[in-house]
């Protein structure tokens, strides 16, 4: 906290330590949540990213309440969204949904298992577009919903939570990634764009790519890689700690 205060000075109102849900597996650390310096009146605040507005609750939300490591990838979704019908699965608070709408999507559907998450996604859409944009939300299992969508969507985003937080569950996790991607690939419209991610540090980018290729074969679809994605430069990777490259993604064109 003191080091951050030295850098940011009076601009820094508070520092909140949120360790209880984020410490490494079996790290043996005494993780606690609470203020290290200062305090703010309300845990939910409005933030701005590339001109888009978001409500963020850093105390109760996942991790810091907003996934800053996906901001460059959200910008990429904005570039591809024009004229497309978009499905944002595991939407959390709707970051990708807001960017898709800003990019000119016809409509956006945001899906998450958490009722509170989809409420926040809807609030963030209204914060940016009022009631004018055709946005729907569903609080349900995203994998099950993918079975039902037919060929309604031509841009699908798969950004699930970490399926493998450690190597002991890696095999089951890869089967989960394969099923998820196969369902999306089998349903997306011809000419559609699939954004698919893994944030599991135990999953290498090579293993993730191979798993997605297997999913494409299962779905019987021909795909081309348009982009291979990673975390931004302010989430640097130590060359001696390859597991630090935890975020990997693919943008696929599906014929």
Where are these regions (language model features)?
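C-terminal catalytic and target-recognition region of SAM-dependent MTase-like enzymes
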Residues: 193-255
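Mobile active-site "lid"/loop adjacent to the S-adenosyl-L-methionine
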Residues: 153-183
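S-adenosyl-L-methionine
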Residues: 114-157
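Non-catalytic substrate-recognition/targeting regions of SAM-dependent transferases
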Residues: 1-66, 75
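Conserved SAM-binding motif I beta-strand of class I
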Residues: 107-112
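Conserved class I S-adenosyl-L-methionine
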Residues: 83-92
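Conserved SAM-binding loop of SAM-dependent methyltransferases across substrates and taxa
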Residues: 93-106
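Helix-to-beta-strand junctions that scaffold the AdoMet/dcAdoMet cofactor pocket
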Residues: 188-190
């Amino acid at each position: 906290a003191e080091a951050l205060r030295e850098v940011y000075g009076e601009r820094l109102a508070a520092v909140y330590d949120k360790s209880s849900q984020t410490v490494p597996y079996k790290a043996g650390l005494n993780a606690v949540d609470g203020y290290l310096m200062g305090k703010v009146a309300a845990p939910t605040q409005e933030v701005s990213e590339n001109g888009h507005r978001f409500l963020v609750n850093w105390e109760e939300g996942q991790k810091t309440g907003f996934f800053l490591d996906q901001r460059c990838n959200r910008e990429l979704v904005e570039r591809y969204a024009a004229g497309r019908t978009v499905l944002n699965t595991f939407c959390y608070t709707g970051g990708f949904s807001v960017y898709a709408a800003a990019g000119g999507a016809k409509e956006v559907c945001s899906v998450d298992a958490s009722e509170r998450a989809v409420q926040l996604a809807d609030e963030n859409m209204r914060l940016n577009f009022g009631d004018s944009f055709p946005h729907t939300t569903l609080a349900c299992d995203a994998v099950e919903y993918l079975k039902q969508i037919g060929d309604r969507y031509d841009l699908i985003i798969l950004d699930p939570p970490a399926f493998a937080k450690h190597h002991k569950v890696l095999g089951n996790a890869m089967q989960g990634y394969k099923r998820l991607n196969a369902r999306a690939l089998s349903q997306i419209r011809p000419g559609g764009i699939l954004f698919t991610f893994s944030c599991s540090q135990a999953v290498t980018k090579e293993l993730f790519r191979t798993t997605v290729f297997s999913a494409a074969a299962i779905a019987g679809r021909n795909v081309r890689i348009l982009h291979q994605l990673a975390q931004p430069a302010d989430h640097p990777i130590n060359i001696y700690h390859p597991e630090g490259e935890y975020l990997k993604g693919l943008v696929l064109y599906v014929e």
